[in-house]
Amino acid sequence: TATHLLHLELRNMLGDHAMQKGSLVDESYFRFDFSHHNAISRDLLEKIEQNVNATILKNILLNEKTNVSISDAEEMGALMLFGEKYDEKVRVVQFGESKELCGGTHVGSTSEIGLFKIVSESSVASGIRRIEARTGISAFNLLNASYQKSRNLETLLKTKDISSAINKLLNDNKNLETKNQKLEKESLSNLIN
């Protein structure tokens, strides 16, 4: 179900060309390959993720139609994957605006997904991008581990503003390197003279 919600958001945000090209799905992790030529910005990925989570929170019930003819499914506006082979009778799975032909397993309502977190976005071939994501408790565990790392950094750096503290450390390090190079040159110059 989460792949369907992601697919809908990709098409809404990137355009109708963003069609599914493959996927691997298990209960807490999935990867989703789709057609698109450019990397997706972090800001846009966050917006896509927010929209998928907003849909999850709406608790939209599964609307499933079985034994539907291909022509009836087309008439209903169900998304069909180009090049995919379908039987004469198909299953249409709908969650709100998302309506696709599908033979996969689905939740009874979107809220059963719990949480959706994009882990990565990358290129897998020319014109094909991949999003890897986690759902449910796996997504929660990932976010919790990240939160714990942030807390540990706050303790180590003695600040809540981790970015500023790291920038200060990097600048201090750069200044020390510059001073060190200057001292090495002076020392070498003194040895020669």
Predicted regions and their residues:
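Ordered, soluble secondary-structure elements with a strong preference for glycine-centered loop motifs
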Residues: 1, 38-46, 140-144
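Short, well-ordered alpha-helical packing segments
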Residues: 3, 7-11, 49-53, 132
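Terminal appendage regions of diverse proteins
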Residues: 17-19, 27, 113, 117-193
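Alpha-helical hydrophobic packing sites
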Residues: 2, 6, 106, 138, ...
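Non-catalytic interaction/regulatory segments
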Residues: 34-124
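Divalent metal-coordination and catalytic microenvironments
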Residues: 4-6, 32, 92, 104, ...
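Active/ligand-binding-proximal structured segments within catalytic/core domains
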Residues: 1-34
